[in-house]
A protein has these predicted regions:
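Short acidic-hydrophobic catalytic motif
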Residues: 1-5, 13-16
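Non-catalytic connector elements of ABC transporters
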Residues: 19-21, 28-143
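ATP phosphate-binding glycine-rich loop
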Residues: 9
Length: 143
């Protein structure tokens, strides 16, 4: 599971399971956090640990589809969120895959366990939604 959760390259991240890859540049790299500017997002990605890099360095941020939260209302968090709309939904019995087109143009895959019977916040095609993720949910890739 370490290769899946902590891939060391874009190739490994894409080879082992589904992944959303954000291309960007390091904005700040401190001991306890790094921020990454990504053209597809309105605000920098915030990661709650530093990396070995430098400002302006090209990196990728790998985020697994099951690590993303999907809501209709804007999350009460200062970073790691974006607005978009649901373009497609694939139902697989135990889970569904949502294809969300961000306002910046990038498409994300989001996986969720099916819980229709007790979930009051159901989603459907063309819904306007917010995607968000925690500060430690993704991996910064330098190669």
């Amino acid at each position: 599971d370490e290769i899946y959760e902590q891939p060391n390259s874009r190739y490994t991240a894409e080879f082992i399971g589904s992944v959303n890859l954000f291309s960007g540049k390091i904005d700040k790299d401190e001991k306890d956090f790094v921020t990454i500017v990504c053209p597809a997002l309105p605000d920098p990605i915030y990661v709650a640990h530093g990396v070995t890099g430098f400002e302006g360095m090209d990196v990728a941020f790998a985020l697994r589809p099951e690590k993303i939260k999907l809501t209709k209302d804007e999350p009460d968090m200062p970073h790691n969120k974006a607005h978009g709309s649901i373009e497609d939904i694939a139902y697989f019995g135990s889970h569904s895959v949502y294809h969300v087109r961000l306002d910046g143009g990038m498409k994300l895959l989001c996986h969720f366990a099916n819980r229709r019977r007790w979930d009051s916040e159901g989603f459907t095609w063309n819904d306007k939604v917010w995607v968000s993720w925690g500060d430690l949910e993704g991996v910064v890739l330098t190669s």
